[in-house]
């Protein structure tokens, strides 16, 4: 009888070692390639204040200092990226402050974006001809609802935009967007 124990070979063969390292290199390369792609498709986390507001940003995503907008003439409308990146108009008031009510730049007819016309003192939608006054109320259709409002607040030279949940001051009713 043979007294030697019949053991499996505990050491790894050269082929197994090379397969292991090849798999590890492929996994590391795939992870390195997938990471930037997932970062591209995932939006960055918004910085919010205690009321759930977000910082006003320019078109490339940098926060806009309030002082940059407040140096403009009264009545100027600045277009910024507000809640969920929605284009939002901010207005410089006569006293050199920002109007606490911002107007979201999406037509309530079909969602087109539009410019402020300083000559006519209107928002004019180029898609189907809707017209809105300086406060965002409908002056001419086909749109039948006023423009969405947001709260605007300046804290430490930063502009914070937050959702408007209260009664719409233009209609005296509950906002349609809530």
UniProtKB/Swiss-Prot annotation:
Transmembrane segments: 17-36
Chief location of this protein within or outside the cell: membrane
Catalysis performed (reactions): 2 oxidized [plastocyanin] + a plastoquinol + 2 H(+)(in) = 2 reduced [plastocyanin] + a plastoquinone + 4 H(+)(out)
Pfam families on file: Rieske, TM_PetC
One Gene Ontology CC term in the entry: plasma membrane-derived thylakoid membrane
Example GO BP: photosynthesis
EC number: 7.1.1.6
Single Gene Ontology MF annotation: 2 iron, 2 sulfur cluster binding
Other observations noted: The Rieske iron-sulfur protein is a high potential 2Fe-2S protein.
Subunit structure as annotated in this protein's UniProt entry: The 4 large subunits of the cytochrome b6-f complex are cytochrome b6, subunit IV (17 kDa polypeptide, PetD), cytochrome f and the Rieske protein, while the 4 small subunits are PetG, PetL, PetM and PetN. The complex functions as a dimer.
Name of protein: Cytochrome b6-f complex iron-sulfur subunit 2
Organism of this sequence: Trichormus variabilis (strain ATCC 29413 / PCC 7937) (Anabaena variabilis)
Gene from which this protein is expressed: petC2
């Amino acid at each position: 009888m043979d007294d030697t124990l019949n053991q499996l070979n505990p050491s790894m063969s050269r082929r197994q070692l090379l397969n292991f390292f090849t798999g590890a290199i492929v996994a590391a390369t795939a992870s390195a390639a997938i990471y930037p792609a997932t970062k591209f498709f995932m939006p960055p986390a918004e910085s919010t204040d205690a009321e759930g507001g977000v910082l006003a940003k320019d078109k490339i995503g940098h926060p806009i200092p309030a002082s940059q907008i407040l140096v403009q003439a009264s009545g100027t409308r600045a277009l910024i990226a507000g809640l969920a990146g929605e284009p939002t108009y901010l207005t410089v008031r006569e006293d050199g402050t920002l109007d606490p009510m911002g107007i979201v730049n999406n037509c309530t007819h079909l969602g087109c974006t539009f410019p402020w016309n300083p000559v006519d003192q209107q928002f004019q939608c180029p898609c189907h001809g809707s017209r809105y006054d300086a406060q965002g109320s409908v002056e001419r259709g086909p749109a039948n609802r006023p423009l969405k409002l947001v709260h605007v607040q300046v804290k430490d030279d930063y502009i914070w935009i937050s959702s408007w949940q209260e009664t719409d001051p233009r209609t005296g009713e509950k906002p349609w967007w809530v």
